[in-house]
Curated annotation (Swiss-Prot):
InterPro entries: Ribosomal_bL35, Ribosomal_bL35-like, Ribosomal_bL35_CS, Ribosomal_bL35_sf. One of its GO terms (cellular component) is cytosolic large ribosomal subunit. Gene3D superfamilies: 4.10.410.60. This is Large ribosomal subunit protein bL35. It holds the Pfam family Ribosomal_L35p. The gene is rpmI. It comes from Bacillus cereus (strain ATCC 14579 / DSM 31 / CCUG 7414 / JCM 2152 / NBRC 15305 / NCIMB 9373 / NCTC 2599 / NRRL B-3711).
């Protein structure tokens, strides 16, 4: 049986917090900022947390990540 490998694409996009949750960055932050309000841009800066529905699937991809 081969070793289970960490999904490298997911490893670059998610980080584990101290409590075991997964941090993620928001979408819509690479360009077209002139159309967005200051408030919208400010809210996009803060990292989000992976929702409960997606957590199980992403955790399987990051199984070996410390």
């Amino acid at each position: 049986m081969p070793k289970q490998k960490t999904h490298r694409g997911a490893a670059k996009r998610f980080k584990k917090t101290g409590s075991g949750k997964l941090k993620r960055s928001h979408a819509y932050t690479s360009h077209l900022f002139a159309n967005k309000s200051t408030k919208a841009k400010r809210k996009l800066r803060k990292a989000g947390v992976v929702s409960a529905g997606d957590f199980k699937r992403i955790r399987q991809m990051l199984d070996n990540l410390k």
